[in-house]
Amino acid sequence: MKILPITGRSSKTPWKLIIDSFKGSASLLDDIILGAKFAKEALNLILVQDGRWKTRWGTAVYGQALPDGTQFMACGIYEKTDGTQEKIAIGKNGKGYRCVDQGAWTEVTGATFTTTATKYNFLQSVNQLYNSNGVDRLTRYDGSNFVRYTQIAAPTGLSGVRNVLTAGAYHNYYKITALNQVGETQGSAEYDLTTNKARNSWITTSNEYLTISWSAVVGASRYQIYYSDESGKEMLLAETSTTDVTFKDDGTYIQNPFSTCPEDDTTGAPAFAMIADSGSRLWGITGDDKIFWSGTGLDLGIFSDFHGGGWQPILGGTGEKFEHICHFRSGKGDGVATAITRNKAGIGSIWQIPLEATAIADTTIIVPNPSKLPGPIGTVAALGVVSANDSLYIPNSRGIFSLNNKANVTNILSTGELSGNIRPFYRGLQNIENIAGVWYDSKIFFTASESGNGNDVMFGLDTEQNEWFLKWTIGFKSFLEVTESNGTTKLLGIPENGTQLIEISKNIKGDLGQPFYQSWLSGLIPISNDSTVFAKVQEALVELGRPTGTIFFEILGLGQKGEFSSIATKQIADNLNAIEFWTGDLGEITLKDEEDAPVTYSQASVPKAKKIGKSLRAIQFHIYSSSADTDFTILKVQAKGVIDKLKTPSKFFK
């Protein structure tokens, strides 16, 4: 913005306002405080070219409809070994479908999904596309079918026999778990066999031992034995290498103090709310207070500690629940699994869980070392957390926050709110737990709900300009980035209620073939910092980049009597006469044709001016359109005139 300075007290002092650089949206500030660069309104616009406002991207249906009128619930990407990408869709009927590019959808068999599940998370690892939704057990797509982990039962029928030892006052509590290739069952019912000696006093050379037996479990590959001399505090004691259903405890086995008896069954894999890949392991959260990790290499996706996996309750008693998990980094830059929680206030906390190797006797075990980051920054929107530019962008009930390294400080992760300028808009959103986000074209796009009836708007952060743009009058359940066989990358939206995916592209005009209203409104810009100064505004000018369609340029302002009103409007038309609307001092409207013939604008820069002839204390600019095929970039807005009055108006004293 450039304002010619006022010098002296002459009423003929020239005045000029030029806005040729722009900032983003700022719903936080009132019109008169915004200044010239922030936008009071930027409806259906996007920031481009060093911060210029431009018509937003349009939408069109993409590909074919799901069979039988099935509506979309979720969609993920599976990449084959030849680089071809398949879209894997989950319908609201619980069935899965696949297609390549924009071809026909075919059903995927092997498993169906609970129709009440609404949030899906997809993750591809080692030629398997894992799918979690918080309701169904972990399911994977192997390139042909869905495969769901099959749960096995916990052992039953525990019994025991003493050898040399006799019954006595010393308790020996046992629980047995069964393992398959995926995980471990919950512990069996606790079994207590008393002895006349404490376990650490048994004499092996005297054949003092206990034999514990249990019933075989169908599908088990081996068993683990947990022991304690106190009820309910069993820790891992030993494991069988076969399917034998007996264990001889002679007192020489050492308990593992880091491995307690499981409370959850992982043989079918838990019903993970979300999964992530970090440190060559799969990580999962169950939507309560537990976090799971799998083994590595051939044991990837196996959550039993026998295969390098494990689990840990972290949030017990805090009132928080896990909402999101991802791979991020510590303050030192080391990659680490990072979990984000939620609480009733709509915020929460951030935890990082590095794994450390610890030797117990001749066995090396993996021990988690969770740490909580400072600050009450959590999320309620699992699909809304976005990783971009070495930062996490985290939406919660208070706003959108970032997690990244603090400038000029090493080994420190810092959090801070990014959404201050748009706080009133953001806090007016409904059902923020359904916010979804994606990083695409150096912009972070979010979709959310204003009405409370599904996501119906979009807004975003231009990470190059570090400015917000809002809002777009379209919304989606979530986003999907896909690369077609020809190498073209597209951004797709998964509709709230629809049978086809929606493409979102700068090369498309309109929404699904229909025009949308777009509007840029500046702040109410004072003529001077001195509120008593008025200017006789002689003319206003807008310079548009490659405009098409019908566009209106409106000038508004505060007049001598303190009234705020629309002063004049200019219509800029493609293939139409340019028509001016002028509002006189008495409120009358006159029309005037300025061109003798239709004009088609194809220039990179098209300036259009409008005569004003009004005395104003503050001025505001409005550029808008609702015609089909409209497209424009705002390059510059300006006005000029002369200082009209320097005397304080009498109205100000009333």
Residue ranges and their predicted role:
Residues M1-T106, T112-Q128, P376-S391, P395-K654:
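Beta-sheet repeat architectures centered on beta-propellers
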Residues K2-W15, D20-S25, L29, Q64-P67, ...:
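Disordered, low-complexity "stalk" and linker segments at domain junctions of extracellular
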Residues M73, Y120, A273, S280, ...:
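Beta-propeller and closely related beta-sheet repeat lectin domains
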Residues A89-G91, A276-T286, C326-H327, G333-N343, ...:
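Hydrophobic core segments of beta-strands in well-ordered, beta-rich domains
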Residues N93, V135, D288, N343-K344, ...:
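Residue-level signature of beta-propeller blades and closely related beta-rich strand-turn architectures
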Residues R98-C99, T177-Q181, Y226-E230, F292-D305, ...:
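Predominantly extracellular/luminal cell-surface or secreted proteins
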Residues T106-G110, R148-Q151, L236-A238, F303-G308, ...:
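Beta-propeller fold detector
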Residues H324-A357, G375-F401:
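Beta-propeller domains
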